[in-house]
Amino acid sequence: MIPAKDMAKVMIVMLAICFLTKSDGKSVKKRSVSEIQLMHNLGKHLNSMERVEWLRKKLQDVHNFVALGAPLAPRDAGSQRPRKKEDNVLVESHEKSLGEADKADVNVLTKAKSQ
């Protein structure tokens, strides 16, 4: 068995180590600057990708609106006032026509459904 003097020395050394490390029960590991920068860049990239996807959808909506033959009213740069309710053009009231590419897509879809 270990003598009491040696045990007291070991206890004092262990106590000194515990008080001098100043860990306060918290994890000593911290994130490095490069890790934080990487996470920041990833967040910016994901935000940018969401914005690009939103813009792509909006442009597709505009393209579909023009493809349906809805007249576009010319607007000068200075007038940004809201339109009157009567000036709004409803897309459903216009006759929808299928272009050649759209007809091909419909034919492919009908063949796929029948299988």
Curated annotation (Swiss-Prot):
Residues 73-115 are annotated as: Disordered. GO terms for cellular component: extracellular region; extracellular space. It comes from the Eukaryota. Changing residue 18 to R: In FIH1; dominant form; leads to inefficient processing of the precursor; the expressed mutant hormone is trapped intracellularly in the endoplasmic reticulum resulting in apoptosis; mutant protein-expressing cells also show marked up-regulation of the endoplasmic reticulum stress-responsive hormones HSPA5 and EIF2AK3 and the proapoptotic transcription factor DDIT3. Keywords: Cleavage on pair of basic residues, Disease variant, Hormone, Secreted, Signal. Changing residue 58 to A: Reduced affinity for PTH1R. Its main location: secreted. Residues 26-31 form a propeptide. It holds the Pfam family Parathyroid. One of its GO terms (biological process) is response to fibroblast growth factor. Residues 84-105 have a biased composition (Basic and acidic residues). It is found in: Secreted. One of its GO terms (molecular function) is receptor ligand activity. Residues 51-69 are annotated as: Important for receptor binding. Residues 1-25 form the signal peptide. Belongs to the parathyroid hormone family. PANTHER family: PARATHYROID HORMONE. Interacts with PTH1R (via N-terminal extracellular domain). Parathyroid hormone elevates calcium level by dissolving the salts in bone and preventing their renal excretion. Acts by binding to its receptor, PTH1R, activating G protein-coupled receptor signaling. Stimulates [1-14C]-2-deoxy-D-glucose (2DG) transport and glycogen synthesis in osteoblastic cells. It is linked to Hypoparathyroidism, familial isolated, 1: A form of hypoparathyroidism, a disorder characterized by hypocalcemia and hyperphosphatemia due to a deficiency of parathyroid hormone. Clinical features include seizures, tetany and cramps. FIH1 inheritance can be autosomal dominant or recessive. This is Parathyroid hormone. It comes from Homo sapiens (Human). The gene is PTH.
